[in-house]
Swiss-Prot record:
GO terms for biological process: proton motive force-driven plasma membrane ATP synthesis. Belongs to the ATPase alpha/beta chains family. It holds the Pfam family ATP-synt_ab_N. InterPro entries: ATP-synt_VA_C (IPR055190), ATP-synth_a_Xtn (IPR031686), ATP_synth_asu-like_sf (IPR023366), ATPase_F1/V1/A1_a/bsu_N (IPR004100), ATPase_F1/V1/A1_a/bsu_N_sf (IPR036121), ATPase_F1/V1/A1_a/bsu_nucl-bd (IPR000194), ATPase_F1/V1_b/a_C (IPR024034), P-loop_NTPase (IPR027417). Keywords: ATP synthesis, ATP-binding, Cell membrane, Hydrogen ion transport, Ion transport, Membrane, Nucleotide-binding, Translocase, Transport. Its EC number is 7.1.2.2. HAMAP family: ATP_synth_A_arch (MF_00309). The lineage of its organism: Archaea, Thermoproteota, Thermoprotei, Thermoproteales, Thermoproteaceae. Its main location: membrane. This is A-type ATP synthase subunit A. The keyword Hydrolase does not apply. GO terms for molecular function: ATP binding; proton-transporting ATP synthase activity, rotational mechanism; proton-transporting ATPase activity, rotational mechanism. Component of the A-type ATP synthase that produces ATP from ADP in the presence of a proton gradient across the membrane. The A chain is the catalytic subunit.
């Protein structure tokens, strides 16, 4: 079960390792560094090492484990900060006695779970009940916000059977809490189990994504929505607001479990993001957001190979909570750094490069990642449903959206939220470019909006979007000929577009009145602008200049409403405002002939 190092090239080690399996976890060198077999040629294995290889030398041992890189799944996951291979960073700090991560700290020294933690286990089954993989056996209260459901693990060796015994009371995470009698023998179930990170967890059926994931961000929820179980990409250059977007989604997205994966970002930026996440409070309860969050951190100065592990690890943790019936959101920042790690490892093991040096399997890996999202019927008894939503940022060099990572990502996502440096530098946040962005979920979530908010939602949204497109066309004329060349109707279009941008699309992520915005407030803000547009058209037909409409008191107040009205009073106050706006615009046509 062991071999010897033959040569070392950065994060890649070649070893003579008879019997090695693809993607098998191995320990490299005297320090027992984490590694994963990524290529096999006869008895030779190419290993990507998840720790710094400085000081390794040929002839040192390589030890096989016989199992793939796996996530440890069970209570005590929530509230922890892991590295790419699920080692708790706080435990590593206490072992290292240094702010820098020491090498060779294995799961024996820093286990991903606190196996000695005691929880009050409440059984959901009783002796004699028939259970199958995926069924809930019981639950523990992991945090004040989350109940952790213990399921019969859907491992290949676990078969359906009869409950022989089930625990009730206080038990450790590593204690047996149930015995299942199957045709293959008796299975002892603990509160935790392992799952290979590259293998998607099973489900019974994939459902269409019909319920929107409300984020509190107006440009997303209304203009370019994402559904629960959907996928989204947030590409943008440096300074365009990707990290603030991830923070906002972490805090306000209506998912029960949030898993941010900081993959390959700058260390200082990751530290700032971590400090911000640790201070966040759950908006509905006031409890620390960390009680329903697990964070995976792999900065740019950590070994590049671990970036790949961090992405798969975060997705596996998300699937685990999805299998408990929760709505889960995985936020990866950023997939470009993961792709760069793939490129470096692929070139070092001698694989044929493709476009811009990336490996030919880049689209396959991106597809495997995004396809693990979904709203699904869970395996086991009953019709339990869970969802895993994936939103990932992309960092194209120089903001070039035609580079391979961004262009391939476009093939596999349902929502595209490109961040514009032009908008960011003009202090328009979120800097989502509404002319480039798209969402494939508008049709599927329309029923939810019509049923829960208003049947007019889709029609008004489409009108406002068409006004923004028309504004872009008119801006070309204005640049050449000036506003004097425009008709009153076209001037009105520009005025309405300004209201859409300033009064609806722009949003202050740090203002508690402006963020988050409830669905009903979003709709009524949108409707107020729509009323200004429609009633203004009638007034212009009656001979009222667009400049007079723009100077009305209610119209002047329109861009400020988002900052003035809280979510709890928005419905009543905005309804009154729309009536006043309609009345004031109509009063301008009194005594005029069309």
């Amino acid at each position: 079960m062991s071999g010897r190092i033959e040569y070392i090239s950065g994060p890649v080690v070649k070893a003579e390792l008879p019997g090695a399996r693809l993607y098998e976890l191995v320990f490299v060198g005297e320090l027992k560094l984490f590694g994963e077999v990524v290529r096999i040629q006869g008895d030779k294995a190419f290993i990507q090492v998840y720790e710094d290889t400085t000081g390794l030398k040929p002839g040192e041992p390589v030890e096989r484990t016989g199992e793939p890189l796996s996530a440890w799944l069970g209570p005590t996951i929530l509230g922890r900060i892991y590295d790419g291979v699920q080692r708790p960073l706080k435990d590593i700090e206490s072992i290292s006695k240094s702010p820098f991560i020491a090498r060779g700290i294995g799961y024996d020294k820093a286990p991903p779970l606190d196996l000695n933690a005691v929880f009050d286990f409440k059984p959901a089954v009783k002796p004699g009940d028939f259970v199958q993989p995926g069924d809930v056996l019981g639950s523990v209260k992991e945090t004040e916000l989350i109940t952790h459901y213990i399921t019969y693990p859907p491992l290949p060796e676990n078969a359906p059977g009869e409950v022989e015994w089930v625990a009730d009371g206080k038990y450790k995470v590593d204690d047996v809490i149930a015995r299942i009698k199957t045709k293959r023998g008796v299975v002892e179930v603990k509160m935790w189990h392992k799952w290979p990170v590259r293998r998607p967890r099973p489900f019974r059926e994939k459902l269409p994504p019909v319920e929107p994931l409300i984020t509190g961000v107006r440009v997303i929820d209304t203009m370019f929505p994402i559904a629960k179980g959907g996928t989204a990409a947030v590409p943008g250059p440096f300074g365009s607001g990707k990290t603030v977007m991830i923070r906002t989604l972490s805090m306000f997205a209506q998912s029960r479990i949030i898993i941010p994966v900081l993959c390959g970002e700058r260390g200082n930026e990751a530290a700032d993001a971590l400090q911000g996440l640790l201070k966040l409070k759950d908006p509905s309860t006031g409890r620390p957001l960390l009680e329903r969050t697990t964070i995976i951190v792999n900065t740019s100065n950590m070994p590049v190979a671990a970036r790949e592990a961090s992405v798969y690890m975060g997705t596996t943790l998300g699937e685990y909570f999805r299998d408990q019936g929760y709505d889960v959101l995985v936020l990866a920042d950023s997939t470009s750094r993961w792709a760069e790690a793939m490129r470096e490892v692929a070139l070092r093991i001698g694989e044929m490069p493709s476009e811009e040096g990336y490996p030919a399997y880049l689209p396959t890996r991106l597809a495997e990642f995004y396809e693990r999202a979904g709203r699904v019927v869970l395996i086991g008894s009953g019709e339990r449903v869970g969802s895993l939503t994936i939103a990932a940022s992309v960092s194209p060099p120089g903001g070039d959206f035609t580079e391979p990572v961004t262009s391939n990502t476009l093939r596999f996502i349902g929502a595209f939220w490109p961040l514009s440096p032009r908008l960011a530098y003009s202090r328009h946040y979120p800097a989502i470019d509404w002319l480039m962005a798209f969402s494939r979920y508008v049709d599927t979530v329309e029923v939810w909006w019509s049923k829960n908010v208003s049947p007019e939602w889709r029609r008004i949204r489409d009108v406002l979007q068409s006004i923004l497109v028309k504004e872009a066309e008119l801006q070309e004329i204005v640049r050449i000929l000036g506003t004097e060349a425009l008709s009153e109707y076209e001037k009105h279009i520009l005025n309405v577009a300004f209201m859409i941008r300033e009064g609806f699309l722009k949003q202050d992520a740090y203002n508690p009145v402006d963020t988050p915005t409830s669905p009903i407030k979003q709709f009524l803000l949108m409707k107020a602008i729509y009323v200004y547009y429609e009633e203004g058209l009638k007034a212009i037909e009656a001979g009222v200049p667009a400049s007079i409409l723009r100077e009305l008191d209610t119209v002047k107040r329109l861009p400020r409403l988002r900052m003035e009205l809280t979510n709890d009073v928005a419905k009543e106050e905005l309804t009154k405002f729309i009536e006043a706006l309609t009345s004031e615009i109509r009063s301008t046509t009194a005594g005029r002939r069309p």
